[in-house]
Structures are given as C-alpha cells and as structure tokens.
Curated annotation (Swiss-Prot):
The presence of a 'disulfide through disulfide knot' structurally defines this protein as a knottin. Residues 27-50 form a propeptide. It comes from Cyriopagopus hainanus (Chinese bird spider). Disulfide bonds join C51-C65, C58-C70, C64-C81. This is U7-theraphotoxin-Hhn1a 3. Expressed by the venom gland.
C-alpha cells in the first residue's frame, strides 16, 4: 500500500515538473513570436512609399507607380491608379 501511494505521489511530482517546463517554454516562444512581429512592423513602417499602388488615390502631388496611370473612374468620386497595361522592368 505504501509503495502504491509513493508511486502516485512521485508520478504527480513528475507531471508537475514537466508541466512547469512546458509552460515556461510556451511563454518563451510567445515572447519570441511577439518580438518578431514587432520587428516586422517596424521594418514595414520605415519603408516610405514614393508612389501610389493599384487602386490608390492619386493627384498631381501623389503620383502613381510607373506601371500605373491616374484615371477617374465613375462610381468613385476621386482619381485612382489603374494599370496602364505595361509591366515594370526588373
């Protein structure tokens, strides 16, 4: 009887140690993941867009990219950048 109780207590202790290790590992992974996301957001914010992309609003002071042209499209009340049927050269 004492051996069975000792085995159960020992098994519970092992499970407690293992679950604590998994929880700590999970927290570390989530912290690394959030840091990676913040780094990606910061990198994308530093890139300045010099031209407007497809369906972006355009004016004289906001030009479209090279492969797009600024046009007025009927249901929309402002000019948008549309494809000029060319491809950008790489």
């Amino acid at each position: 009887m004492k051996t069975a109780i000792f085995t159960v207590v020992l098994a519970l202790a092992v499970f407690a140690v293992l679950s604590f290790g998994w929880e700590a590992n999970g927290k570390a992974l989530s912290e690394e993941f959030t840091e990676l996301i913040h780094e990606k957001e910061a990198a994308s914010e530093t890139e300045a867009r010099e031209c407007r992309y497809f369906w972006g609003e355009c004016h004289d002071h906001m030009p479209c990219c090279d492969w797009l042209v600024c046009r007025y499209k009927w249901p929309i009340t402002y000019n948008i950048c549309v494809w000029n049927r060319t491809f950008p050269e790489k």
